[in-house]
Amino acid sequence: MSEAIKTDVLIIGAGPCGLFAVFELGLLDIKAHLIDILDKVGGQCAELYPEKPIYDIPGVPMVTGQGLTDQLMEQIKPFSPTFHLGEMVEKVEKIGDPGFRVTTDAGKVFECKVVVIAAGGGSFQPKRPPVPGIEAYEGTSVFYAVRKMEQFRDKNVVIVGGGDSALDWTLNLHPLAKRITLVHRRDDFRAAPHSVEQMRALVASGKMDLRIGQVSALEGANGVLAAASIKGNDNSVETVACDMMLPFFGLTMKLGPVADWGIALENNLIPVETSAFETSVPGIFAIGDINTYPGKIKLILCGFHEGALMAQKAHRYVYPEKRLVFQYTTSSSSLQKKLGVN
């Protein structure tokens, strides 16, 4: 087991509610780490509708999903949160009163006094492409997110998909990889036009390959890939060298391992009390779309409210001997100093 990373609060989910929780906790001198299965912050806002306008954030007539994410990231800068992206929490164990040990699928271990679940509708799970035997290579040669770019250096990399993730990683890994082959079922891409133009320029100059079709088979042994077969739309089959494969077929929402953490559930949601949005396990809170209570409305602004009340209760666990004096950012010089505005 790796050495534990110690923090006051561990937030599971780096969407808007998780990000704003950092702000509310930071005002109370509570440090936070955040874990998200996605390879970027913003949750559904950034992943599913980055350009979609949002009209119901108080005081902001219109903001896009990505715009809101960017503003929240700017707002929490003074508190220097640490992000662990492309990781999924697998286990939450109680080790003290208060105290929890949290383990991710990347083998990281955290020890904290409070856990905040801000995971939206659950964890995003990558869609597995329908390639026979692909499971044998997952985690060794087939990856659904890029954690360390360096592992792709001098490798023959096959990237499958036609959206922003596929094109972004095609362009980002191209300078490192021995050869990039992008595979998409049609010669029409959903990615940003500029990214598509860059990719086509690389193909035209012979610096990477584009194949229209689908990966139909994999070759290798002991979890190590050697080649991939690509079936074209004309039913022709081509075999290309493949050391690593990155399929980007989109994401589905699943409750995931939350069901194994000993927390009471109700219709795949986490019931909470409404004074601080604490779950059935003291010290574990749930805010945002993943929780449920009488009168619950799934709005971002409601999640912000839940985060503010959660932070007040979390302070009792982190600083049990310290009396909390409520202050306003408009008038408190100490809070303004924390925010860097005084």
From Swiss-Prot:
UniProt cross-references to InterPro entries, sorted A to Z: FAD/NAD-bd_sf, FAD/NAD-binding_dom, Fd--NADP_Rdtase_type_2, Ferredoxin-NADP_redctase_2
Leader peptide range in chain numbering: none
Keyword Transcription regulation set for record: no
E.C. designation(s): 1.18.1.2
UniProt name for this protein: Ferredoxin--NADP reductase
Cross-referenced Gene3D superfamilies: FAD/NAD(P)-binding domain (3.50.50.60)
Family: Belongs to the ferredoxin--NADP reductase type 2 family.
Obligatory cofactor(s): FAD
Binding residues annotated for FAD, in chain numbering: C17, D36, Q44, Y49, V89, F124, D289, T330
Keyword Oxidoreductase attributed: yes
Pfam families given in the database record: Pyr_redox_2 (PF07992)
Assembly and binders: Homodimer.
Cofactor binding note from Swiss-Prot or TrEMBL: Binds 1 FAD per subunit.
Keywords: FAD, Flavoprotein, NADP, Oxidoreductase
Catalytic activity: 2 reduced [2Fe-2S]-[ferredoxin] + NADP(+) + H(+) = 2 oxidized [2Fe-2S]-[ferredoxin] + NADPH
PANTHER family reported in the protein's UniProt record: THIOREDOXIN REDUCTASE 1-RELATED-RELATED
GO molecular-function terms, A-Z: ferredoxin-NADP+ reductase activity; flavin adenine dinucleotide binding; NADP binding
Organism for this UniProt entry: Bradyrhizobium sp. (strain BTAi1 / ATCC BAA-1182)
